[in-house]
């Protein structure tokens, strides 16, 4: 008989695995084996007094050898049971139940059942010495207990199943019931099978967005705050640092932009002008260097020729006079010299004639006549034609040389790349590039409104008349009449052929192609750019002809007669049908 405060001492049935022995434990005992005498009083699950030894050993639940597994005791008992005798039948418990199986002969109202046929409702479903049937409802499914001998499938919402134990000996899952804190009686074990590793979905900054609270549903959450979406979360420090660096960089760039915007562009324009002037000077210097190079080459050739002539003269002098008939070099030298003198004399003659003409002009003081100007222009034109012919011949020679050079590279160097293609492409880009103007253009891109209106009027007048065409004028007839009707025939307060100030429909909400309120709506979508109210095809104060192509500006053309009625939909009050003649020739 266990006296005092005992916590979970006892055996399960006839099977004694605890190392405590069979003597009665006195005082505060934690996990020692008690004798088979029944406990009396308030006892937290002493597993004593086995009536009939059980044939099958099962682990009882408790913080030791068994917390809730004993025979029926008198008094207040939390889960008393007869460890050996399994309960035969008991009524199914409904509602919130810990699922510890009420014993067969227990009549205590506070006994938590151990063996039950079916537990429906919210149960914690611990498997003790009994054989539970199918449990339906919300169950934690063997939270911390070993599976019994025969366990059927649990239907319903299960939060557990076979989870892995969180420790070695403390939360083990063997089938033998041992005493102490590390046994497989109702210990704090979360399951029996191996853990399964799930791949974590990490988002920006290493945050697992799959565990966010916005993925939860209101139906599955037991608390109302579980279904609230998380609006603001703190970013990781790495991303915060990057954002701060980016903001600092943007701020610095804005400061640089402000400094640049405060600077004047005159200095840059002056530098640009200086660069242009330097380019011109460089081109002049390059042309001068080219001329000097040609002159140097020419002087080199002349110097070599003079050295040759001097050597010939020296040898001629040393040659005896009797052998001079075989020496033809002096004759060639004198012949070339005479030809040069002839060319120089012709140049001198031309220059002398020009000088005489100039002196004669200065002496006579005669004014230049238009014939002289025309003759000078003709001579300049002939000079340009001759230069163009020479340039064309030079261009053809350059093309031939380019082809020869490319053939040489392809033949001897094995390089078929056109080396002149890059320069040709650059020149083409330079030609096709638009010239950037430094200021607004003095010529407007918009056409003249008066010219467009005149052209529209002439075009309309040249077309054959297909109906009553109102003339250009001022009238309070057709356009000003506020007709109540639909169609293309105008109806108003005056005659229809008196013209009008841009004879389109009058003040009102027209039904010919218009859907909103407007000051004059026409029936053709190809009208001019008009100003006014409304959102139809061509709406507003349209002083143009909508029958022609679209023109820009405020034009004073002639429009097709279109009525304006105080109606926006179908035919409300049609006063007169349009005649068939007005529809001829229209597209």
From Swiss-Prot:
Recorded coiled-coil stretches: 244-264, 302-369
GO CC annotation: nuclear envelope; nuclear membrane; nuclear pore
Phosphothreonine carried by residues: 319
Keywords recorded for this protein, A-Z: Coiled coil, Glycoprotein, Membrane, mRNA transport, Nuclear pore complex, Nucleus, Phosphoprotein, Protein transport, Repeat, Translocation, Transport
Maturation and modification: O-glycosylated.
Record region (14 X 2 AA repeats of F-G): 7-567
Primary site of residence: nucleus
GO molecular function: identical protein binding; nuclear localization sequence binding; protein-containing complex binding; structural constituent of nuclear pore
Biased composition (Basic and acidic residues): 213-234
GO biological process: mRNA transport; nucleocytoplasmic transport; protein transport; regulation of protein import into nucleus
Comment on protein domains: Contains FG repeats. FG repeats are interaction sites for karyopherins (importins, exportins) and form probably an affinity gradient, guiding the transport proteins unidirectionally with their cargo through the NPC. FG repeat regions are highly flexible and lack ordered secondary structure. The overall conservation of FG repeats regarding exact sequence, spacing, and repeat unit length is limited.
Family affiliation: Belongs to the NUP58 family.
Annotated protein name in UniProt: Nucleoporin p58/p45
Organism of origin: Mus musculus (Mouse)
Gene this protein is translated from: Nup58
